[in-house]
């Protein structure tokens, strides 16, 4: 079998993490079987679909490294195809016009609720006479098109993730609306289940891979495949992504779109790596870092979990850190540059590039997200240092002024070319010995004076970087004023 899969997002919002994870699984399966990965944009919702969302979705997929082999196909450009299919159902007596008003449907559901029955359409307009239809039309009623679903129909399929699935027609909510109403009485806007089946048949989709929240839709769609005489594809219903409370991840949980993750400073390979693990386990359970290509070579549905996949920020951060720590220095510096520029830090990206590479090397072992670099390196770029409360407490301790003065004097006298880490250490050792100070006091005081905080990257490397900017002596002198106050 030639594998043809599709990702079919709706442009009613930015690319969601759930849709992106579904895209990852489709892409992995296609690549594993040397198949075709197709992009279809389901933009039939005219009110909610927006061009900017379409662009966001396409950009997000490209950014993640999931280029499609065919498409994008747009459902809004295929409406005639759907209407032809609906007319075929009408002509064959498999669908009909339903003239129920919203008020009548509400009354029906209310009565069902009072009887403790599940809400469903009672198929009351399935067998209208021509006279009844004419009477409804004379009232100005606008009909929807409903596809007939018999209560005694049995729908079965072997799900690639969940195994044998069984549904009864009576559990599908009655005859299904496949097209909206129109004032003219013509076939209106085709709805999701109809359009999906027509597209999947037309595009020869072999496998439909999507979230478990579509299982009920699958039962309905199989009936449509059978009605059209089409080949029913294989189905794989993947686990939902859950929040920490075990509920489906939603916008209420905050960050959910791929562009949000980009803004937070996650790289595409790290995020794609993490999404691969949201519901799938590699054969080697200890392997957690791999490229999409590596994952594709190992991917199969036997290792896709049935249970929901909880979104774990700590795990994502750890994976992100592994990628950042392993990036070549120049590549990481290039990735950090936009964050420094957005923060309006004072530097020349060309003239200061050697210094920026050193800054990158300093913070790389501690970097978790690209965006973290803004706060981590602020003390290196700023010309007006602000001392934290902890740093000021350190500077106010006894003997700190003596310690700082013992470093300032030789530093001020040293020639630019003479300064190095070894020389800096000699200044520290000399003031410790000459003033009978504890080395820890001197080191803590220098950190407070030079960085404005009591924690941060390696002190000596930070000092050298500040010296190159001509900032170290100035800061030590300012800190001495605080210590002497």
From Swiss-Prot:
A motif ('HIGH' region) lies at residues 9-19. It catalyses: tRNA(Glu) + L-glutamate + ATP = L-glutamyl-tRNA(Glu) + AMP + diphosphate. It is found in: Cytoplasm. It comes from the Bacteria. InterPro entries: aa-tRNA-synth_I_cd-bd, aa-tRNA-synth_I_codon-bd_sub2, aa-tRNA-synth_I_CS, aa_tRNA-synth_I_cd-bd_sf, Glu-tRNA-ligase_bac/mito, Glu-tRNA-synth_I_codon-bd_sub1, Glu/Gln-tRNA-synth, Glu/Gln-tRNA-synth_Ib_cat-dom. It is an enzyme of class 6 (ligase). Keywords: Aminoacyl-tRNA synthetase, ATP-binding, Cytoplasm, Ligase, Nucleotide-binding, Protein biosynthesis. One of its GO terms (molecular function) is glutamate-tRNA ligase activity. One of its GO terms (cellular component) is cytosol. SUPFAM superfamilies: An anticodon-binding domain of class I aminoacyl-tRNA synthetases (SSF48163), Nucleotidylyl transferase (SSF52374). ATP binds at residue 251. Catalyzes the attachment of glutamate to tRNA(Glu) in a two-step reaction: glutamate is first activated by ATP to form Glu-AMP and then transferred to the acceptor end of tRNA(Glu). Monomer. This is Glutamate--tRNA ligase. It comes from Acaryochloris marina (strain MBIC 11017). The lineage of its organism: Bacteria, Bacillati, Cyanobacteriota, Cyanophyceae, Acaryochloridales.
């Amino acid at each position: 079998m030639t594998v043809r899969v599709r990702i079919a997002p709706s442009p009613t919002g930015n690319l969601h993490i759930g849709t992106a994870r579904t895209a990852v699984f489709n892409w992995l399966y296609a690549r594993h079987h040397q198949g075709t990965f197709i992009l279809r944009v389901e933009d039939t919702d005219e009110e909610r679909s927006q061009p900017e969302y379409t662009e966001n979705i396409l950009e997000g997929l490209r950014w993640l490294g999931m280029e499609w082999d065919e498409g994008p196909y747009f459902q809004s450009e295929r409406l005639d195809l759907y209407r032809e299919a609906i007319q075929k159902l009408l002509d064959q007596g498999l669908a009909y016009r339903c003239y129920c008003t919203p008020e009548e449907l509400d009354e029906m559901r209310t009565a069902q609720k009072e009887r403790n029955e599940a809400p469903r359409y009672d198929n009351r307009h399935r067998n209208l006479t021509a006279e009844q239809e004419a009477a409804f039309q004379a009232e100005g009623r606008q009909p929807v098109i409903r596809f007939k679903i018999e209560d005694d129909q049995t729908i079965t399929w072997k799900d690639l993730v969940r195994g044998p699935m069984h549904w009864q027609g009576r559990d599908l909510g009655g005859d299904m609306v496949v097209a909206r109403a129109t004032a003219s009485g013509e076939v209106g806007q085709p709805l999701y289940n109809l359009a999906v089946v027509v597209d999947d048949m037309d595009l020869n989709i072999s496998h439909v891979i999507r979230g478990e929240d579509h299982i009920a839709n699958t039962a309905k769609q199989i009936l449509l495949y059978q009605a059209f005489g089409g080949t029913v594809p294989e189905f794989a219903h993947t686990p939902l992504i859950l929040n920490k409370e075990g509920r489906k991840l939603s916008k209420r949980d905050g960050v959910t779109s791929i562009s949000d993750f980009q803004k937070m400073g996650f790289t595409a390979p790290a995020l794609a790596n993490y999404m691969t693990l949201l519901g799938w386990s590699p054969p080697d359970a200890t392997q957690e870092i791999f490229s999409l290509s590596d994952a594709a070579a190992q991917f199969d549905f036997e290792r896709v979990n049935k249970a929901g996949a909880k979104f774990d920020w700590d795990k994502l951060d750890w994976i992100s850190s592994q990628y950042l720590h392993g990036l070549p220095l120049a590549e990481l510096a290039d990735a950090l540059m936009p964050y420094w520029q957005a923060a309006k830090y004072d530097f020349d990206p060309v003239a200061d590039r050697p210094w920026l590479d050193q800054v990158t090397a300093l913070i790389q072992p501690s970097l978790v997200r690209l965006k973290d670099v803004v706060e981590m390196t602020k003390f290196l770029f700023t010309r007006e240092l602000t001392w934290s409360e902890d740093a000021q407490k350190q500077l106010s301790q006894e003997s700190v002024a003596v310690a700082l003065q013992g470093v300032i004097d030789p530093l001020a006298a040293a020639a630019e070319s003479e300064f190095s880490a070894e020389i800096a250490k000699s200044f520290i050792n000399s003031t410790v010995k000459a003033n009978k100070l504890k080395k820890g006091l001197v080191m803590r005081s220098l950190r407070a004076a030079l960085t404005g905080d009591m924690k941060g990257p390696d002190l000596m490397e930070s000092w050298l970087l500040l010296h190159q900017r001509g900032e170290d002596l100035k800061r030590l002198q300012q800190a001495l004023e605080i210590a002497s106050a």
